[in-house]
């Protein structure tokens, strides 16, 4: 096993990209990305950081709908493993943003675990009016369930 200091070097070039940045009609995004990196960047990019690739509903992949399934247009887990061959792979672990269709939110709305513990309802507080953000959508979204209407933080709207 590598020592922690051997995992990264200041000389590494890191390619940061979305899985579908390289378009090749009819080819899953991760396969097209692997082909492009192998053909053009193999000698340079020691690390490929693939921005959110899990199944999502919006927000550039950050509104995660499933933490176990890849976005179908990107390919599947074997495509991600193939991209990792011969290089280091980096990914965002998006736990603090989920889609309303994510199982945790659906469980929260039914007052079931684990969603009940994963989604936090907001406690009304006048200080929320002081939150400044670069979005026009509401800071909170109302969800209805067995406990009635509850407000949850909405990062992206």
State each model region's role:
Residues 1-157:
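Acidic/aromatic-lined carbohydrate-recognition and catalytic surfaces
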């Amino acid at each position: 096993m590598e020592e922690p200091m051997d995992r990264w070097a200041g000389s590494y070039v890191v390619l940061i990209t979305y899985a579908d940045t390289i378009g090749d009609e009819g080819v899953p995004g991760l396969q097209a990305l692997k082909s492009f990196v192998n053909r053009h960047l193999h000698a340079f990019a020691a690390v490929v950081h693939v921005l959110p690739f899990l199944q999502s509903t919006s927000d550039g992949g950050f509104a995660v709908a499933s933490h176990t399934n890849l976005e179908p247009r990107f390919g599947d887990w074997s495509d991600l493993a193939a991209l990792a061959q011969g290089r280091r792979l980096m990914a965002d672990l998006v736990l603090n943003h989920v889609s309303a269709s994510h199982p945790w939110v659906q469980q929260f709305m039914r007052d079931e675990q684990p969603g009940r513990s994963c989604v936090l309802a907001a406690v009304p507080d006048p200080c929320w009016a002081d939150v400044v953000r670069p979005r026009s959508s509401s800071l909170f979204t109302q969800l209805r369930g067995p406990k009635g209407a509850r407000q949850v933080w909405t990062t992206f709207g």
